[in-house]
Every structure is written in C-alpha cells, then in structure tokens.
C-alpha cells in the first residue's frame, strides 16, 4: 500500500476532516480546545493554522535577570521533583539538569530530561548561591552580586534544591 506524503503547505480537499499531523503535537503537555476540534479553524479558512505560541511559551522557557544587586534564573520545571533536579556551579557556569525515569501518566508512559547551562556574571558571590523550587514548579536560582574589585570566589560545588510551599513570584509568560 502506497502512502502519499504531502507537503504541509498543501491540504487535501477533505483536509478539515483529517486529524492534525503527528509532529505538530507537544508531547507531555496538556491539550487545548483547538487540539480537540481542529476542523473548526479549517472550515473558516483552509489556509488558517492555529498559532502554537501559547504551547511554546508554556513549555519551560527560562528567564534570566541580572540587575545591580543580584542575579536570578527562573526556570519552569513543573514536571520534576527536587530529587529529579541537580544544580551545579562549575567555575563561571551554573548547570541545571533534570531527569526522571519512565513513569506512568494519563496517556501512557513518559520520561523527561533536560540540561541547561548559564554563564554567571563574574561579580556574583558564589558562596551565597541558593536554589529553590516553588509549589507551582518554578525553579529559582539566585545569588547576590559583590562590589567590583572584591573576589567573588570560583569553585565547583553542588547547590541543594529546597522546596517552597507557596507558588512562585516569577512573572508568567
């Protein structure tokens, strides 16, 4: 049996009645209304595609803030527990690694892993770095800055992740 592969810019005549393409899905994330009824947008206009910005913004984008007094990283890690996260400082970098083995959810089995690496400003006091995970899954890594000319200290060490019972005060995307 031959299966015709079709370029995504073209639709079949019965396109609204075919399910969306497999690679358009965000695995491990929740479904939105337009995911359940994709034919509605196609009946309005055959060339209209639902925007995926909402899904992309909710998929774990980080925010880095560096002002005069402190350096802060906010990272959405809602699918990970503190035991699944490892935060290390290696010279001028902070490495955040999250991994959980295969576990069952509503749709079957899933495993996740990510690795992020950020450069620390040279004037961040590495002896006073802290990391916490809020109740809503926002990881906050922060450290105060020292005045220029003072040694900020550079070493390799692990930063423990503490759990907070309140939601994060980080801005939502």
Curated annotation (Swiss-Prot):
Zn(2+) 3 binds at residue 154. PROSITE patterns: SHSP. It comes from the Eukaryota. Keywords: Acetylation, Chaperone, Cytoplasm, Eye lens protein, Glycoprotein, Metal-binding, Methylation, Nucleus, Phosphoprotein, Zinc. Acetylation at Lys-70 may increase chaperone activity. It is found in: Cytoplasm; Nucleus. The modification Deamidated asparagine is found at residues 101, 123. GO terms for biological process: lens development in camera-type eye; negative regulation of apoptotic process; protein refolding; response to heat. Residues 144-173 are annotated as: Disordered. Its main location: cytoplasm. Residues 52-162 form the sHSP domain. Signal peptide: none annotated. Residues 1-63 are annotated as: Required for complex formation with BFSP1 and BFSP2. SUPFAM superfamilies: HSP20-like chaperones. Zn(2+) 2 binds at residue 107. Contributes to the transparency and refractive index of the lens. Acts as a chaperone, preventing aggregation of various proteins under a wide range of stress conditions. Required for the correct formation of lens intermediate filaments as part of a complex composed of BFSP1, BFSP2 and CRYAA. Belongs to the small heat shock protein (HSP20) family. This is Alpha-crystallin A chain.
């Amino acid at each position: 049996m031959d299966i015709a592969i079709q370029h995504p810019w073209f639709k079949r005549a019965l396109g609204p009645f075919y399910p969306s393409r497999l690679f358009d899905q965000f695995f491990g994330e929740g479904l939105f209304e337009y995911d359940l009824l994709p034919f509605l947008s196609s009946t309005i206009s055959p060339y209209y595609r639902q925007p995926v910005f909402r899904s992309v913004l909710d998929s774990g984008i980080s925010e880095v803030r560096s002002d005069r007094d402190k350096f802060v990283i906010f990272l959405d890690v809602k699918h990970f527990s503190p035991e699944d996260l490892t935060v290390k400082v290696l010279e001028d970098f902070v490495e955040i690694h999250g991994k959980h083995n295969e576990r069952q959810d509503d749709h079957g089995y899933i495993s996740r892993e990510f690795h992020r690496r950020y450069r620390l400003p040279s004037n961040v006091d590495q002896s006073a770095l802290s990391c916490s995970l809020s109740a809503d899954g926002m990881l906050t890594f922060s450290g105060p800055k020292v005045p220029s000319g003072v040694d900020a200290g550079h070493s390799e060490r692990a930063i423990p992740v503490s759990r907070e019972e309140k939601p994060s005060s980080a801005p939502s995307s």
